[in-house]
Design a protein with these regions (language model features):
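Short coil/turn connectors at secondary-structure junctions
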Residues: 21, 53-55, 76-77, 111-112, ...
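N-terminal beta1-alpha1 cap of cysteine-dependent amidohydrolase-like domains
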Residues: 1-50, 161-165, 169-191
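Cysteine-nucleophile active-site neighborhood
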Residues: 30-103
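Amide-donor transfer/coupling interface in amidating biosynthetic enzymes
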Residues: 88-191
Length: 191
């Protein structure tokens, strides 16, 4: 999806690679495993530093869980990179996966098809965090603050590049103006 819109994407596997990028996507998967790997390979403090100094960050599904301030579950301990509280697997198990049409603030045109697979939900948003999409019953499924974006669905599964284009804009802003990112929750070291 990223190459489709002209992004020269790399897989970040070493902490030193963070210095080469203006934006990072933490994808779906298993949030506990993602946090364990980020911790084991000493990404956590470096990632916080990069986000605090303006790097764009996007957490999708499990990535949203990873970057949240707080979870309804005791594990994993999230990284506190955006001031939201999240409930894991809100819509149920794998068999309960579904698709929905969403109107996303900042995305023009028709509603965007969103794929929810064991998806989390945003329960609360902190000061300055903007809810940019919700389900028909009002559940927040996409939020943004500064250059940090979090979505509970998998936009990479639909072929629609509009949300990726929005993220590209955030990464370009980071490249052009790497000032402090206004996205982070309180004190990240408190997690």
């Amino acid at each position: 999806m990223l190459r489709k819109i002209g992004i020269d994407a790399i897989e970040v596997r070493k902490v030193q690679q963070l210095s080469e990028i203006d934006g990072l996507i933490i994808p779906g998967g298993e949030s506990t495993t993602i946090v364990k790997l980020l911790t084991r390979f000493e990404f956590v403090d470096h990632l916080r530093e990069k986000v605090n100094s303006g790097m764009a960050l996007w957490g999708t599904c499990a990535g949203m869980i990873v970057i949240a301030r707080e979870l309804a579950d005791p594990y994993p301990i999230p990284l506190n990179l955006i001031d939201i509280s999240v409930a894991r697997n809100y819509f149920g198990r794998q068999v309960d996966s579904f698709e929905a049409e969403l109107h996303i603030e900042g995305i023009n045109g028709d509603p965007m098809r969103a794929v929810f697979i064991r998806a989390p939900i945003v329960q609360t948003v902190g000061e300055g965090v903007k809810q940019i999409a919700s389900t028909d019953d009002g559940q927040a499924v996409a939020v943004k603050k500064g250059r940090v974006l979090a979505t509970s669905f998998h936009p990479e599964l639909t072929g629609d590049t509009r949300l990726h284009t929005l993220f590209l804009k955030l990464a370009k802003e980071a490249q052009e103006d790497p000032r402090q990112n206004s996205s982070t929750a309180g004190n990240p070291s408190s997690t």
